[in-house]
Amino acid sequence: MIERVLTDEHKRKLIVRVNRSNIQIHTERKDLLDYQFDLNVELFKFLKEQAVKVWKTFTPKAADSFGADYWEFYDRNTDNNGYLEIRNGLKFQSPNDETTLLYQFNKRRMESFIYDIESLIHREAIK
């Protein structure tokens, strides 16, 4: 497993854990249900680089189904949903206050997430 800690300009931290089949986003504390992190190019590049390594046929593309939309994911361990949206940064809702997990990407959700981030970079909304 690969793990990297990223810090935004407000000193908030995200822990990215990469394993054989998914990419997880964590915080340092379990009690944070809502969490915001400033999106930056370093995070984007790391996520895309790792996605290409985990999923050999990784191709960013628009969400074309509910399963491809990264807005919501189901966490089997807590039997609850977590949420992610891009609005003035990344806004996470953890599935449970008993876990540090904020979000877990599968291949298709990561493809649509990276596609949306690339669109923002193209419009120069992210620096």
What is each stretch, according to the model?
Residues 1-127:
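Positively charged, low-complexity terminal tracts
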